[in-house]
Amino acid sequence: MEVEKIMQALEQKHPGEAEYLQAVKEVLESVKDVYNQHPEFEKAKLIERIVEPERVITFRVPWVDDKGEVHVNIGYRVQFNSAIGPYKGGLRFHPSVNLSILKFLGFEQTFKNALTTLPMGGGKGGSDFSIRGRSDNEVMRFCQSFMTELYRVIGPDEDIPAGDIGVGAREIGYLFGMYKKLTHEWSGMMTGKGLEWGGSRIRPEATGYGALYFVDKMLHTHGHDIKGKTVAISGFGNVAWGAAKKATELGAKVITISGPDGYIYDPAGLDDEKIEYMLELRASGNDVCQPYADEFPEATFVAGKKPWEVKCDIALPCATQNELNGDDADMLLTNKPLCVAEVSNMGCTAEAAEKFIAAKMLFAPGKAVNAGGVATSGLEMTQNAIRLSWSDAEVDEKLHGIMHNIHEQCVKYGKQPDGYIDYVKGANIAGFMKVANAMMAQGIV
């Protein structure tokens, strides 16, 4: 495999799609040595097929606001790869949404889902719509219009969306309700549903919980205990909340959260009351974290900066893609944390990730660390299919086992001759080989 040649061809085909090209290059660099041991892959043009989505659906989403004004947004669904199961991946409603971001997320999702060992392919979708400042009725009308087109290409055995940034329990409810009205059927065609109508226990916390199970295992493998360690978290949304909750439960001290307006430094650490307040911050819809410092005066709000300047043992980017850049990496390396783990999808820029790996720091990629969310979605799909509901303890036990299995796969494929574990390479190779073998078995399709 000639990575540069492949990337040049992709750049010509997809100019300006920076996030997608970044994600593809990271995987290709990781798997090239293994790929080159399989001439049958080259003959079948496996790489050329695996980097392109099977299908991309784009549609307009017209809706009317509370003043009677008509708006038109763009809706997308990227059905990336179905080799190991129906397409599975979230919906994101945010002004930054574009095809490049959704293709990167769908590509990553393909390998992340493979790591869980559950039968799920990769997909992603969403719209450039923002829920910020919109009333419940406006959000409902938008979701209903969005589903009027999306329902044609999804279903429990075809494509199962879930939530993501801007798509929480409220939005999933509106989307599910419209799907049910249009199709005259109740099915497990979405995950992240409410407990009263087919949802799974601990699904809201699952991404954060799974991330901490992975980090805990990573630390233990290298002779460290998470108990008593300080944790810097970015974001204050669903993922950050779950991560803070589980980190505190495991005995660590979470000392930061952040938002677009800056970050909160709380040296005393987040307790149950403060973690629950994160839900109030999110529910306010204002997308700022500063009110935390008003509510808890012992904490400090630092405007316009990221939390990576704070000395910590564990750094967990939990907000969005490429939030931790090369300069942030330099700052973290100076403060010498034990590990950095991407809880957000591709939370570190390529430059930052390269610096962590070059310094032999414990660094784990999002496709492994945050797989707990989609793993629990897979468990929700199973519960819907067998018409049963498992308890918190049953779901948590299964999630724990899945995350430990993902860690073992990363170690198996990522251990270097000098003993260093390259978790990025390990995760990419493990996920890639499962998808590649499935594609080879199914012929040129």
Protein language model annotation of sequence segments:
Residues 2-23, 218, 333-445:
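Adenosine-phosphate binding glycine-rich loop
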Residues 21, 37-44, 117, 154-163, ...:
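Flexible, glycine/charged-enriched surface loops at secondary-structure junctions
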Residues 1, 15, 19-22, 26, ...:
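Conserved active-site and cofactor/substrate-binding residues in soluble primary-metabolism enzymes
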Residues 94, 113-227:
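Glycine/serine-rich phosphate-binding loop and adjoining beta1-alpha1 elements at the start
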Residues 191-194, 199-311:
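Glycine-rich phosphate/diphosphate-binding loop of Rossmann-like nucleotide-binding domains
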Residues 262-363, 368:
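Rossmann-like adenosine-cofactor binding region
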Residues 40-71:
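Structured beta-strand/loop patches that form or line metal/cofactor-binding pockets in enzymes
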